Regions:
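Short amphipathic alpha-helical surface micro-motifs
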Residues: 1, 13-16, 27-31
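Short, intrinsically disordered terminal segments enriched in charged and Pro/Gly residues
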Residues: 1-9, 61-116
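Short, flexible, mixed-charge glycine/proline-rich loop motifs
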Residues: 4-15, 36-42
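Short cysteine-rich clusters marking metal-coordination/redox-active sites
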Residues: 18-21, 48
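Short recognition patches in nucleic-acid-associated and regulatory proteins
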Residues: 20-39
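Short metal-binding segments enriched for Cys and/or His
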Residues: 41-67
């Protein structure tokens, strides 16, 4: 089972890659850093604050196994939400305004959920 040992919200001094959306965390940007232990292995998990927040808002953690939410599942869940809510039947695709990288998508979904 996954255990969170520590969670901090530092400001990036160097570029990182978000474990959820696979996009860059830029220097100067605040992000989430978790120190976790799973199956006896201690590791750090870094993600955008917005990605962590949208994962909670969309209840992505509810169907996780003992290892927690991974990036592939996060991106798949985010794609499913956008497809379900922003599908354009005329183009047989999501609306062009939603055809963005997963970090931008997470920010757009959060904004949308906060306006509901």
């Amino acid at each position: 089972m996954l255990t969170i040992l520590r969670e901090t919200y530092p400001t990036a001094k160097k570029e990182h890659i978000c474990e959820f959306c696979a996009c860059k965390i830029q220097p100067g940007q605040k992000y989430v850093r978790q120190t976790n232990v799973y199956d006896g292995t201690v590791y750090d998990f870094v993600t955008h604050q917005e990605c962590k927040e949208v994962a909670h808002e969309l209840m992505m953690y509810d169907d996780c196994d003992d290892s927690g939410l991974d990036g592939e599942s996060f991106r798949s869940e985010l794609d499913s939400y956008v497809y379900a809510n922003h599908y354009d039947e005329h183009t047989d695709d999501v609306y062009t305004g939603w055809q963005v990288n997963h970090y931008e998508m997470a920010k757009k979904v959060l904004k949308e959920l906060k306006n509901e």
